[in-house]
Design a protein with these regions (language model features):
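A short, structured beta-strand/loop element
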Residues: 15-51
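Charge-dense, helix-prone N-terminal extensions
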Residues: 7-13
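Local beta-strand/beta-hairpin segments that build beta-sheet-rich folds
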Residues: 1-6
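C-terminal structural segments of small proteins and small subunits
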Residues: 55-84
């Protein structure tokens, strides 16, 4: 699964295989925790990311949601700037 961003120990990835991976989403991994977030409404689909890490992921998503949606639609992965 390609890593598209890394910040504060949080790994953001994106992977899809046609309709098998809908709805559009990204997994976020922090240590042994993982959550999946919708690119449609930025709501957590599932997972157990700690609250502090989840807030950072959502803040980052707000800044880059258009890029994330474009990447999902085009299936063209690139690195996105980390949260600073």
């Amino acid at each position: 699964m390609p890593t598209i961003a890394l910040f504060y120990g949080i790994i953001i990835q994106m992977y899809f295989l046609s309709s098998e991976h809908n709805p559009p989403h990204i997994p976020a991994i922090y240590n042994d925790h993982k959550s999946t977030y919708s690119l449609i409404d930025m709501i957590k689909i599932n997972g157990d990311l700690p609250i502090k890490a989840e807030k950072l992921v959502l803040e980052w998503m707000k800044l880059h949601i258009d890029e994330l949606r474009e990447m999902w639609d085009s299936q063209s992965f690139k690195r996105i700037e980390p949260l600073e």
